[in-house]
């Protein structure tokens, strides 16, 4: 997989980015620099969406901003899009401004209600903002650069408190930080109604800090917490974030995002989608997802870490870190990683599984119809660490992937560990290494296959019987009375 990363980066670098339109003043310099970086990245924010079967879409398919290609969805979001030379805005803030109790309205096509540029600082308190446009186009220009967002900061700072933001237009993100823009927003309600309209959004290296927001989105490719090409940094403290649209996770992550004490809900998509060299850290959050069945996907998941090769994020290790709080799956399996390097860390999270609970963790190649990597060589390299964590469901791996799975500090797993070569092509030299410390327990529910097993803890079946452990050549290492067998290449008790 690490060798494949170099190949992916070369592939990504070949993506050509062409021009598009422009309308007001400012911000082209930063956009140009970020655009060059994005072109090298070689990804596209398709995660949220319902990507086209033959394109490089995001997992859920529709979150491909205009290009269509989220895990669920319709294709490549942004090949051929370049940064705008200018923006069209009702109010462009180019010097320090402070206002309170005002109402702002925007109705024109693909315009911003408020644009902060030229290093200015805007402070708004107790404000109302309405953006409505039936002719706006949304798509990649909105996802990557913030065209059509209600409030956009490209080179300056927007401090927003006690407001209400409502958008009813394609590409109508609530607030958007791009490039050298920073948004600090608190105690505000954001409602977006159409496609490609995230609640809070960063791209191109922007910075956003949110506190105690109430955010609800309804369109496709409209994650309540959303990022896109060029990434950025986002910190969220408190609040409620709900995504209702198809292909709209609660969190769509192509940035470095930290969320504390928030409620995060996706009613028509996976809970979380992370692509490429990006990270999501959750502490004491309540997170839930409900991905629909989709014939383009070879499985259903609640949290996905992957690489679509669409061009929206840099190839590299995807990181999901969750401590405390709860994670609820309404359909399919829990964690899926494919065509990427990934790191998962779970610490004392309350888990609620779907009725099917297809898997706890799937670390394999894929046969996704949108083409996430080359079939037969698109596995995952995954490090998964569970601390004080109860887990239920099977772990699935294949020979074109590598898995390092560690249980410690009183963790437990109830399930089988299965080598499934369905999407491994001609196979490879992958492995699944499992380490169980002396305080942790694996309750085996089916015959299992592990490359290297290190266990100073407990391994039994669901009746409390010891499980037979044998080598792949048939040599019995530990004879048990259970009907289940764990086959290993190597075994150690410490």
What are these regions, as identified by a protein language model?
Residues 1-11:
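Positively charged n-region of N-terminal signal peptides that target proteins for export
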Residues 16-19:
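C-terminal motif of bacterial Sec signal peptides marking the signal peptidase cleavage site
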Residues 21-85, 370-374:
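Disordered, low-complexity segments in secreted/periplasmic proteins that are enriched in proline
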Residues 66-83, 129-154, 172-173, 177-179, ...:
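Acidic/polar low-complexity surface segments
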Residues 73-136, 483-487, 491-494:
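N-terminal segments that cap or nucleate solenoid repeat domains
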Residues 96-101, 121-127, 158-162, 182-188, ...:
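All-beta strand scaffolds that present successive hydrophobic residues in beta-strands
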Residues 106, 131, 167-169, 192-194, ...:
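Residues in short coils/turns that link rungs of repeat/solenoid architectures in beta-rich domains
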Residues 353, 378, 382, 386-491:
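Extracellular beta-solenoid/beta-roll
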